[in-house]
Design a protein with these regions (language model features):
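Acidic, Ser/Thr/Pro-rich low-complexity intrinsically disordered segments
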Residues: 21-93, 99-101, 140-171
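Extracellular and select intracellular beta-sandwich modules with Ser/Thr-enriched
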Residues: 104-108
Length: 171
């Protein structure tokens, strides 16, 4: 496939749903972005040149005027396309840190979808999941409390399957 874009070294701040191209510098470059409300933020970084080295990325949050790292480093292999990582982020100022070899070209983008905080923290207020229903939510960085859900079984003669899943990144 063929794609077009502008390669801009140190492209600076980022907007959701825009794709940026950056050639590696050998050192870390920072790309600020802001989150207006609690969201699931998905980053897509593609290391385009198959003959170049590995690209590394992580997220930092601005707290009390200082940048604080909030996750572990993500490793993007050469010629890998659509390497995504997702974070649950609260309102605030963030930046994406990327370190790539000087011979690597990276395509970078992110999308953000707001998530409500309508969850039950107590067993007595557990959120009901209906038959054939589903629910999803996020934990933002630093959240450690339990969430409660309940299901109702209407018949003892039918088998019901409960599928639980999780997607995680460290942070």
């Amino acid at each position: 496939f063929v794609t077009t874009g502008v390669i801009k070294d140190g492209f600076g701040s980022m907007k959701a749903s825009d794709t940026y191209y950056e050639s590696g510098t050998g050192s870390t470059t920072y790309h600020p972005f802001s989150i207006k409300k609690r969201s699931a933020v998905q980053f897509n970084i593609s290391a385009i040149d198959r003959n170049s080295g590995i690209t590394y990325a992580h997220i930092e949050k601005k707290e009390n005027g200082q940048w604080k790292r909030i996750d572990d480093t993500v490793k993007i292999k050469p010629a890998s396309y659509d390497d995504d990582f997702v974070h649950g982020l609260t309102k605030g100022e963030y930046r994406l840190a990327i370190k790539a070899p000087t011979t690597q070209l990276n395509a970078v983008s992110y999308t953000s979808s707001s998530k409500s905080k309508k969850v039950a923290y107590k067993k007595s207020k557990a959120k009901k999941i209906k038959l054939d229903g589903q629910t999803s939510n996020i934990y933002t960085t630093g959240e450690k409390t339990s969430r409660w859900y309940k299901i109702s079984i209407t018949s003892t003669k039918k088998k019901r399957i409960l599928n639980l899943g999780k997607n995680t990144v460290s942070g």
